[in-house]
Amino acid sequence: TSQTAESAEVISHAPVAVFSPKTLRTARAIFENINDNRWKAARRKAAKLGDSLLETLVQWLDLERDGKQSFEEISAFIGAHPGWPRLRTLIAHAEEAITDATTDTMVLAWFDSHRPITTNGLVRYGEALLREGRDTEGIGIIRRAWIEGNFGYRQERTFISRHHKRWTREDNWTRLDRLLWEGKLKAARRTMRRVDKDLQVLAEARLRLRLNRGGVDWAIRRVPAHLLNDPAFLYERLRWRRRHDRDNAKEILEELPFDLAHLQLWWIERAAVVRQTLAKGNISAAYQLASNHRQIEGASFAEAEWLSGWIALRFLHDNETALNHFTKLYDSVRYPISRSRAAYWAARAAESLGRAELQQGWYAKAVEFPTT
């Protein structure tokens, strides 16, 4: 199972120890209990065995299960074992385990050293701050919970009834915009009525485009003129056109501003349109779309530079331009496999240019990472 694999990973980093045959038999029985989901039995055997590392390992595996343990136990484990793996998962479980029975003193002490990362954590922390009379801090956290949080239906109704006067209509729009970007459409639908009319119309158009339902043209026609160039609206129109293999998808990409949010999502759509354009034989247009990618860093930047270089090399036979893209890619990535890949393609471009010395230099860089 995955948990057995995780336990093996932890043990692999532990100091080498020699176990007696009895200890090994008990350890085997413990992990059989875990595989059978008999956690109480596994923890009893681990405690009885008296091996502190094994006991801690079994507790860690148990605490990783979602919603199974108390805030007190999880937070105590994190405090005692700050160097253990996957602590962010445990921190999230600790926050989700905070209940009405958890004292404000405990909640505030916890968040003094841990920034809230879950919806329940934000709500519990904000409410504890308000009860302590720390209104400015508390309202700030409550607003953040509303903007960033993902609530179940009943949880959302309770939260709104308690705190709806603590945030603004602008906060409602910030939340709605996020939910639409993230595809959380049921929650977005519930939030739509809390924003101004023009923004409701915009949100409705985005939602219909995302769902690929009827009435798209009607919804688009209703969008006010001053919102027609809203980047999120353009993104959904781009996705709709790309899914319907419309040639005019690239028109949206050609006119975009450079200061876009959600760059990775934009790149996914741009890359798909680039490949569609390439498949139709529009090679120069495909290259222009790829090379004007707007990406700044990370995996999407690397993919964009590679695709631009590949089109230049294989289709345009513009070897100098291809070499520039692959060199830029090499200079921007850090993982060995990425650097090896960039160097290999730079070598291919140098080979096409007939620059043998440069080609050999790039091939030498490519093989510096033998594990790739």
For each feature predicted by the language model, list its residue ranges.
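TPR-repeat structural position
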Residues: W39, F71, D104, D135, ...
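Residue at a conserved register position within TPR or TPR-like alpha-solenoid repeats
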Residues: N33, I98, L129, L179, ...
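Compositionally biased, proline/threonine/alanine/serine-rich low-complexity intrinsically disordered stretches
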Residues: T1-T23
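Solenoid-like repeat scaffolds
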Residues: S12-F19, R43-L53, L63-G67, S75-R86, ...
